[in-house]
Amino acid sequence: MSPQWMPQNIQKRLLLYVLQQLSLFSEIDLPNLEEVSLNNIVLRDISIDPEKVGKLPGCNLRFGQVGTLELNTVTGGTIIGGGGGVNVDARDVEVVISPDFDINEEVRKEVQFSLAQSTADLAKTIIKDSDSAAEDESDDTDEEIVVEPKKSRSSSSSSFSGSTSKPSALSAVMSRAVEMALSRLQIKITNMKIKLVSEMTDLLFEVDEVLINTVNGTRVVKITGVRSMTLKPNVNPGELVEKVVQSPQKDDTSDNEEDDSNYEDDNNDYGDESLMDSMVFTHEEASSIYLSATSQSFPRPTSYNVDEGEVHVGNESVSSDPPAIFHMDYCDVEFDGLSNVSNLKIDIGTIKVATTPLAPTIISILNGITRSLKIKNHQKWTQQALKRQQNSRFPQYAETTDELTDDEASSKDGENTDPFFNKLHIRDIIISTTSALSRDGVFASPDNSINFVLHNSNIKQKNDMLIYGGVETFRIEQVKEGVTTDIFTFESPTAATHAEQSQSQPDSEGVSFAHGSPPPPIRPMSPSSISSMSSSGSKSSTLKADLRFEIFKKLEENVVTIETTALLSKTALLTLDLNSSLILSNFITAMNSIHSNFKVLMATIENLSKQQSPKKQKTHTNAAEAMTTKTQFILQTSPIIMSVKFTQDLLVKAIIFPISYNLQQNQLSISKILINTTIRNERESTTITISNIVLLTKLHEFKSFIKRIANPSNANPIPREVQVTASSNLFISKIMVNIALKELKFVISNIVSFYDSFASLSAKQSNSLENSVLDFVRDRSHKLEISSILQPPGQSRRRIGPGFASPHLSNPTFVNISRNNIASFRCSIKEVELNLVQVLPKFGGLTLRLKDILLYEQKNDINGSILSFDIVRVDDGQLQKFVYEFQELPLESIRLPLIMIHCKNTEKISTVDVVIRNVLVEYYTQWLLLLDDFEANEEKLAELVVEKVKPVNPSSSQNRFDIRFSVFDCIIGLNPGRLPCKSYLVVGRGTSDFTFGVNQFYIKSSFRDVSALLIDDVKNKEKMPLKDNSTSRSRKSLPTSSYTSPLTFFSNLGYIMIGGLNVVHIGITFNTNIEEVMKRNEKLGISDNLSLIDLKINSDEHHLELCADSTHVLLQLINDLKLPLNFKDDEKMKVTVDSSINLMDDLDENQFQLKKRNISVAPGVETSSSSAGSENENLETIAFDEDHFSKARNKIPKGSKVDPFKLNINLSKTKIYLYDGYDWKDTRKAVRGAVKRVEAQAMKERLKKLKKQTDKDDYDEEDEFIEETLFSSIHVGIPRDATDANLTDRINKRVQSSLQETDMTPEEAQKAQINVELGKNYKNLKLRRSRVHKIMADFTNIEVNVSVYSTRDPRKDPTDENLPYELLNDVEVRLGTADVYDNVATSTWNKLLTYMNTSGEGEIGKSMLKLAITNVRPSPKLVSSEAIMKVQVLPVRLHIDQDTLDFLMRFLEFKDSRFSLPLDEIVYIQKFQISPVMLKLDYKPKRVDYVGIRSGNSAEFMNFFILDGSTINLAEATVYGLLGMPSLGKALGEVWGPQIQQTQIAGILAGLAPIRSIVNIGGGVKDLIAIPISEYKKDGRLFRSIQKGTQKFAKTTGYEILNLGVKLASGTQVILEQGEQLLGGEGSGARLPASRGSNSQKCNVNKRSSYKVAAKVDFNKLLANSQVLNQSVRVDRDQYANKKFYSYIDIDEDDDELVTGIDKELLSKSIFLLPRDDNSKKEGEEDEADDSSADEEGEKLISLYSNQPENIQEGMKLAYKSFGNNLKITKRQLINLKNELNESENIQDSLKSILKSSPIIFIRPIIGSTEALSKALMGLGNEIDSKRIVESRDKYRYIKRAKDEDVL
């Protein structure tokens, strides 16, 4: 214990020393000396001299003033502890300081040893004075006080530290005495104000009282009433009672501006040079400068007012002081020692913080420090550069310094075993998020506020190795309407424990602990031990604090580990609503902004530390090599329960299982998160379960896929796999969601409503960062200042000083890693399962499974992928797949992700790019029956999509948001509701863009390479496994190059390709703001009606390839893809009436008296005709208006009505190929069975005839034919006396057309190989699809326009009583051109149907067919509708061959009972109108069905006559009241039948071939007389009239005579060719070219080449047999040649021989054309043979009238050429005869050869003569009438000629 006395001498010397220190103040005048005595000195209004104070650490003193300073000495017993001492009492202290970041070593050492220097000076003074005059101490002290100005503190320090003389014993004693004297020094400071000024921030600190003294050798510092206020920037103080934001008045604003102007120079020059360094001034100058600079430094009471009155809080008015950010009621500090402080104890009372003004203040401080450090570093770098230049002669001394390093200095200090820190205790910390803070520490607005409360916080240090502590209570409380509730708290202990806690007792050291004793220290433990400890149920666990932690230092060899463990052992409860979420979100936003600015500051400090001197760096490097420091942080929590009340009806609770974090492992893990929902206060249910969450904060590599850029050579780019490294990685094992659809909609709607309210109210909160700075001053400088305060880090692109790059780019961890493959964050989810329970009552549920989900952020973009996903419908345990991978591969076999996502954000646009690959979406018609609730709410859904969509704010239109979908090899499966068939639409590639505009929402899509696949029965698919089973087994090992396309996959399953298209564009426009769009259209002059939804489809080229059975299946499938329309009788018609109806009231008695009316007629006009006309007029007035609905529609002004929906379809080119044969196995089996049955019946008949078991009469009564009819179109019949081969040959001839192999294109050969050669059929029956098509329809410019005017359902929606009728929709179909080509082998004609070119070229824009349908509802209350149809047709030219007609009838009449559907609601045609139709017909019969004639089929008589140019003109027809299309055909027949009989017989008979020329010549004679008469009546010129008539007569007569000659010559040629062929010659085959195609009717311009088909090929002979190596082959230009796929599998027989020994994929893609190998028949197959094994010797017939010359010159050339060709044939025959004669051995052989060749030798020149004559006559006739050549090209097939490139 210190002695309780002090010698008088020491007291005097102490007072002398204190008086000497008064030189720190400016010169003291007499007015300042209020009282001076020996033991008491009182000074008033004195200023502190900044120059005498000198350099302070980290700051500069700008101004200092003490209101009252009293110094006195006291005798023992008057102060604490007894004994004498010195009291220093300062009141009203005001200090202004500015930060200085240029902290030199000299300043730091000076401050460190300042107290030791003062002690040494005092000791010297005592020793010196005691030796000279010890007896006169008091007098000498009074008279000899001479204060010499010190040169500098550094010199004193140097002299003190540099003294090497050995101290005397008296000196040590006196130093001890000085220590004793200083221990009796008591300092008391009252009402101290410290203002911290900087360039961006001004702060004011106020302290009510500071008391410093020593008690029992312990230094005690007591601080009372500490508060901090922000002067600059002008921040929002927070909410007051009335929530009025304070604003400065004009007078105070001018004062503040004056203050800012006073400091403007200092702020501008602050970064470069301080005021103390740049000026040398006297005390008077300094005083004047600082007084002027600080005259208004401290705020006045009138600086802040609210409006014109005062806002009261309770009974006290709100202080008009600056915004307070901090208040502390008291702080007690105790420590031992002076130069070496130890055993530090801090006890703090209550701390209150207002975050509303605090956040912008801290941000401003951090930005200011960062800026100052950068400027100082730039100055230091410049000085070092100059210093290096000055020491260039002695570079080894450039960085030399004599100063001691930190380690050396610390080694010289005496070691102190006592720890520096002992404990810290804070009673309460209260942080308010919204309320303002008053001067006295009371929150100005406690209502509607959220406070963070930390109660009883303790930190203790047990020894140098362990620091522990905790927070007893942590909670977040909300004050609302005077009621305080906890929104965050920890679980409360038991009641008994709570009673114990309420009786807290102080510990032995005076610090109160809640549990009566300090918490035990936490030992270093693993997370598992912490978890077990927290989960224990002992009583001690309930007494633990809410938060506990320990810091443990562990030494192991050269490694120092500092381990920090934090434990939250209680369950946390968090409850949020809209108000609390708003406040907390703004609070978190402010904290994040502070953290971001702090990170920038730390990065700047780190860069500064790297620029230290090399010597210091070397010293630290050596120390680092000797000792390594590691940091470990472990966090363990208990479960956290968070509840969010979105609305009154929705409560969401999240249960977060214990959280564990390990810093060394960089891993945070959560075992599970449960999210429960409570809807409408009902039972709580678990909705979301998240399992195994792991967060890694270290580098981790992973694989990802990136999208390749598509190019024309690679239509389906395979994504590229890359390696990516992420610094943060989040792993989630599984996310499972279980919720009903209604609940999901309810939850989403409530969350959206919550979000909208949150977004609209967030910026309006007083504690938001945007409202934290009050920008009342509108000048530019303040705006820039405030924007710089709140500017988030990283946005400033200005670089200040060298070496200050972004801290993220300078991370040494990323060295040697490509920045292109670095991701900042990665999220990997193994599986996500969403179970939508009870989507609809009848529908069941949907299950969505996503597997291997990857999301990562790279270069501010978000990339991601989903490896696999599927959607399944679940109903009563049954699964129905909806969306899935088309091959249904297991997860480990999938090599490419099904979905890839790329999100790119820029300043103007945000784009989300989604790539979907190999996804199959199933459409089920049955689902439409299950979606009753969806259909019931269809109108509401339309309103939600269109009408309820709010227009986008124009201001936000700059930040556009687009979504783009790209699809590759995606499939749409079409499943009809009642049929077993199925179809797939395969999309090769496509894109779809979603654009959100201001007034409209757009969807623009483009799809390419779309193909359609079809199968008749899905059971057939299931029975057909893949050919190569090894493919699926080894798929995992295959690279991405072995990609299987959907076309290949489904073709192997038995599907056939029925068509496709190359490109289709789809555009959908949703008009969300109709009014604005209408205004825009008015300005642009657009008068069309608007629609809510506008759909446009534009497609380029299409093709369909169908057989009769596949066509029937396709049509029935399309019909079954919609719900059947069946209405009840009371819905279609009014079956009951409200009142009785008297039919007699509607009868008009004068109805039949109209004919007897006397009508006056004009003179000279016959009465009968006038009467008839009048009667017709009267009758017409009684009839209803035929155009009533169309006129009503036309009355609607354009642009004044908004339609619900519009559809526009435009198809550029469409080709339909009709094939003979059958695609389906069941059809072929049925035909084969019928053939067997017919043959069996025929066999029985032959047996009966041979055994003569039947009578002759009975046999005659039986039918001549044995026949059977299948599918309503296939007639299998055989004469009773015929053989099996006759039936088989006839079927094969009709189906396969008996084509030679040389007549097919390579494409047709490939299809024939696939369809025919791979299978065997009964008795050589060729029932598969024919090798070539029989009919091809070519349509161009098909346009369909649909306008929907009403979607109202009278059964559900109300009906307007005043509505007389209701227009439903308009449908308009236009067909530009139509050409139907005849490709039947036995037909010689080209076009079956085309435009009549002889009537002149069609008008531009005129459609060949136009169909307009208007659907109306006559009674708006009934659901039934009626159709009004109008048809317009251009003149049509028909060339009908009987074989072609039979094929069409057989094709179109095909019906399979397996695909029959009940009839839907039959369309009622109210009115049908067709315009006049002009027909010109050519008909060529081949045979006559006499059986049909005998059965009464009168139409069969047409087959007796050949028609050539018969004309039929059908007048306009209008019919009414038709039920269905069959009734329409019957009605038209009744209308046109009498007209044809009365007026068109002459035109038909004029086309009879025998009399055609006579009729035409007769027409010429008529023209010879009729034309001159008409012309003469017209102009009166006789000669010209006769000339015109003569020319017409000569032209007609001449052409007909020449045409007659051509027919005679051609007939003669045909007879001669047939005779030659009978005698062994070539016949008509000589006219055919050696190599030609058979497909000219497609476009009449394509080039074909000869080919041969491969049946079974030896792979070893592939190259040797290739025609590519033998001769040139013309390339097939058919654009569909490579797109036609058919099944490679024969499903008819079980013993099919498949092609082996060759890669089938190579064969299908090869350009080689191989020869046939006929030896492919298996042994033992006597009754079955290959389809291709039959002899096919038939030819495609070519007419002699084809390839007609256009003029006489060309005719002569062709005549010469044809005659030469025939002479060449004769020459060749003569050469052959000569060779045979030379080879003959006897005269008989010679005569035989001569007799065989002579007819051919003599006939062939005659054939050449007739052919030459016909060609010459054709050329002459076509030159006379050039229109005939146009007709001939449309009518006849063309073969290739040597002159041009026309081909068949």
UniProtKB/Swiss-Prot annotation:
Keyword Nucleotide-binding attached: no
Compositional bias ranges of the Low complexity kind: 154-168, 525-540
Endoplasmic reticulum found in the keyword field: yes
Annotated GO CC locations: endoplasmic reticulum membrane; phagophore; phagophore assembly site membrane
Stretches assigned to coiled coil: none
Subcellular location: Preautophagosomal structure membrane; Endoplasmic reticulum membrane
A GO biological process held by the record: glycophagy
Keywords: Autophagy, Endoplasmic reticulum, Lipid transport, Membrane, Protein transport, Transport
Reactions it catalyzes: a 1,2-diacyl-sn-glycero-3-phosphocholine(in) = a 1,2-diacyl-sn-glycero-3-phosphocholine(out); a 1,2-diacyl-sn-glycero-3-phospho-L-serine(in) = a 1,2-diacyl-sn-glycero-3-phospho-L-serine(out); a 1,2-diacyl-sn-glycero-3-phosphoethanolamine(in) = a 1,2-diacyl-sn-glycero-3-phosphoethanolamine(out)
Biased segments, Acidic residues type: 132-146, 254-274, 1725-1737
Chief localization: membrane
Membrane topology label: Peripheral membrane protein
Stretches for region Disordered: 129-168, 237-274, 386-417, 494-540, 1717-1737
Superkingdom to which the source organism belongs: Eukaryota
Alphabetical list of Pfam families matching this protein: ATG2_CAD
GO molecular function: phosphatidylinositol-3-phosphate binding; protein-membrane adaptor activity
Compositional bias segments (type: Polar residues): 494-507
Family: Belongs to the ATG2 family.
Function: Lipid transfer protein required for autophagosome completion and peroxisome degradation. Tethers the edge of the isolation membrane (IM) to the endoplasmic reticulum (ER) and mediates direct lipid transfer from ER to IM for IM expansion. ATG2 binds to the ER exit site (ERES), which is the membrane source for autophagosome formation, using basic residues in its N-terminal region (NR) and to the expanding edge of the IM through its C-terminal region. The latter binding is assisted by an ATG18-PtdIns3P interaction.
Protein name: Autophagy-related protein 2
Organism field: Scheffersomyces stipitis (strain ATCC 58785 / CBS 6054 / NBRC 10063 / NRRL Y-11545)
